[in-house]
């Protein structure tokens, strides 16, 4: 029993040391976080990244380096954003992943914030470490207003083939209006991106019927997909009868084979509605259909405009335009 006081004394000393160590470690983390923020505000991104690496162990999406301007842009707080800009904060501050405040504003669809940033010198074509631009983010959110503002300030509508493609993102999300705006800026409707294919192929993969229809109307190649895989292959995999019917009406070739040597019909489940839809179009097309396809092919991508200049009867115009 005489050893009991000594035991409790050692226990209290141990607990005190443990609590002191824990508090000291917490204090260091708080200090480093404040130091990180200081370096971000001063614009020393390299040092901020090094400190964040020590604190967070190299997490790929660290939110600790988001400036107040990032927060204001992401939440659409225009007054706060303008106040920060007036105080002299750099509008082109980026996070460790190269995300700018303009990226945040466009991802949130906050067009007023995006415009304010652009008017104060924000880089319109800034890229994140993943190659995403503010225009890509605007297409992701489906903000046609942001897309228009970015294009007015010189945003590149079409980037290099290996960067994140705005039109593919718009189609993937089903944002037809954003897609149409980009196409008016001479974006290549046949642009094939590795792992994604053409915009039409993406639309078929994600069953974006409105986008499929509009792309076909605007002259997208009905058989150009992802390498040897056609849009029809993608539609069959998704069991989308509506998309299959659209593609076949626009002249999709049922006999084309992919890298595995399979046609769209080979991929269809036996006795399914998809297979029945394909079989309905397996025979030779009508002469009127062949003529329509031939005329549209000769006129090219601008056929939807050129047809009106031919001086044809209204009924024939509507037939050629699939109306």
UniProtKB/Swiss-Prot annotation:
ANK repeats lie at residues 64-93, 97-126, 130-159, 162-191, 195-224, 227-256, 260-289. Gene3D superfamilies: Ankyrin repeat-containing domain, SOCS box. Residues 273-323 form the SOCS box domain. The keyword Magnesium does not apply. Pathway: Protein modification; protein ubiquitination. It is found in: Endoplasmic reticulum. GO terms for biological process: endoplasmic reticulum unfolded protein response; proteasome-mediated ubiquitin-dependent protein catabolic process; protein K11-linked ubiquitination; protein ubiquitination. Keywords: ANK repeat, Endoplasmic reticulum, Repeat, Ubl conjugation pathway. One of its GO terms (cellular component) is Cul5-RING ubiquitin ligase complex. InterPro entries: Ankyrin-SOCS_box_domain, Ankyrin_rpt, Ankyrin_rpt-contain_sf, SOCS_box, SOCS_box-like_dom_sf. GO terms for molecular function: ubiquitin-like ligase-substrate adaptor activity. Transmembrane segments: none annotated. It holds the Pfam family Ank_2. Substrate-recognition component of a cullin-5-RING E3 ubiquitin-protein ligase complex (ECS complex, also named CRL5 complex), which mediates the ubiquitination and subsequent proteasomal degradation of target proteins, such as BIK, DIRAS2 and RPN1. The ECS(ASB11) complex acts as a regulator of the endoplasmic reticulum unfolded protein response by mediating ubiquitination and degradation of BIK. Substrate-recognition component of the ECS(ASB11) complex, composed of ASB11, CUL5, ELOB, ELOC and RNF7/RBX2. Belongs to the ankyrin SOCS box (ASB) family. This is Ankyrin repeat and SOCS box protein 11. It comes from Mus musculus.
């Amino acid at each position: 029993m005489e050893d009991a006081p000594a035991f409790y004394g050692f226990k209290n000393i141990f607990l005190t040391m443990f609590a002191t160590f824990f508090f000291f470690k917490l204090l260091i983390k708080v200090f480093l976080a404040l130091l990180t923020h200081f370096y971000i505000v001063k614009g020393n991104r390299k040092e901020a990244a090094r400190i964040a690496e020590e604190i967070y162990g190299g997490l790929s999406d660290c939110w600790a380096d988001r400036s107040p301007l990032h927060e204001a842009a992401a939440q659409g707080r225009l007054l706060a954003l303008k106040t920060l800009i007036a105080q002299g904060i750099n509008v082109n501050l980026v996070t460790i992943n190269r995300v700018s405040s303009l990226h945040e504003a466009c991802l949130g669809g906050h067009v007023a914030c995006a415009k304010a940033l652009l008017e104060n010198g924000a880089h319109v074509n800034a890229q994140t470490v993943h190659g995403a631009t503010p225009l890509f983010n605007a297409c992701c959110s489906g903000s046609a207003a942001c897309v228009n503002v970015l294009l007015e300030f010189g945003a590149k509508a079409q980037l290099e083939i290996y960067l994140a493609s705005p039109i593919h993102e718009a189609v993937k999300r089903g944002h037809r209006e954003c897609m149409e705006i980009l196409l008016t800026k001479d974006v290549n409707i046949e642009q094939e991106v590795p792992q994604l294919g053409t915009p039409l192929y993406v639309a078929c993969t994600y069953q974006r019927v409105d986008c499929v229809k509009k792309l076909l109307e605007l002259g997208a190649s009905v058989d150009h997909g992802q390498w040897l895989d056609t849009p029809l292959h993608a539609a069959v995999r998704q069991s989308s009868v509506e998309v299959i019917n659209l593609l076949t009406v626009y002249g999709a070739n049922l006999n084309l084979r992919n890298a595995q040597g399979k046609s769209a019909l080979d991929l269809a489940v036996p006795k399914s509605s998809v297979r029945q839809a394909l079989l309905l179009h397996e025979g030779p097309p009508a002469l009127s259909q062949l003529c329509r396809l031939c005329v549209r092919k000769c006129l090219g991508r601008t056929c939807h405009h050129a047809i009106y200049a031919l001086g044809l009867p209204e009924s024939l115009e509507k037939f050629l335009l699939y109306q």
